[in-house]
Amino acid sequence: MSAAPELPSEESLAHQIYRGIRGKIISGALPQGSRLRERELAEEFRVSRVPLREAFPQLEADGFIQSSPRRGVRVTSLTLKDVDDLFEARLGLEVYATRLAAARAAAGASVDALDAALRAAEDAYPTKDPDLIAEANVAVHDEIVWLAGNSLLSTMMHAISGRYRWIFRMTYTPEVAGSGDEHRDIFEAIRNGDPDLAAAIALVHVVHGRKPTLAMLAGTLPRE
């Protein structure tokens, strides 16, 4: 019998469970379309069903699960359109967040946290560990959004960030993951306080990832 997942104590219990279930979905331990059985999950996380049920709405809002009276709660079955929709959303929100981040840096906001996240990502790439690289990669994007200083934008990007982590994990290869050069270029433009250049590089970064990701998933996901 496997040990219960390690959950950080400083979070609310429901959010700990949210992160735990999300991690199992992203890793594939809970496959797409599989049913979430409350009793089994409650035993695994060593909790009652109450915090488990409290975690479900956020998982559903972030696109990881779907619930219906007849089919119960199941892991979302992604389609190619879902993936393409994600990239379209990133083209709008993430590129704009990058522009705002550069503008705030130009006004004197610190880029130290983003620099640290970028260095951690650059250290992760040589390991070829898909989970470590996915976490580090998304952390860079999260720090850019945080630096943008817009709480509503940050909330909107939260769901995108989680689903991006899921898709990144599904399609990971060292070749697709790259070396993080574009992240470094984005960072330099932000640090130099150049919103136009930062947004332009961010746009190219998202576009570069779109086509190979869709191509890799074309044989495994339905179109719609």
Place the predicted regions along the sequence by residue.
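Short linear motifs at protein or domain termini
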Residues: 1-103, 214-224
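A short secondary-structure junction motif
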Residues: 24, 28, 151, 160-167, ...
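Hydrophobic residues in alpha-helical segments
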Residues: 25, 101, 105, 125, ...
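C-terminal regulatory/effector modules of DNA-binding transcriptional regulators
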Residues: 44, 173-224
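Conserved amphipathic alpha-helical segments that form helical-bundle/coiled-coil interaction surfaces
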Residues: 86, 90, 107-169, 180-189, ...
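Short alpha-helical functional segments enriched in proximate histidine and acidic residues
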Residues: 100, 143, 147, 212
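Short helix-capping/hinge motifs at transmembrane helix termini and TM-loop junctions
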Residues: 102-106, 149, 172-173, 218
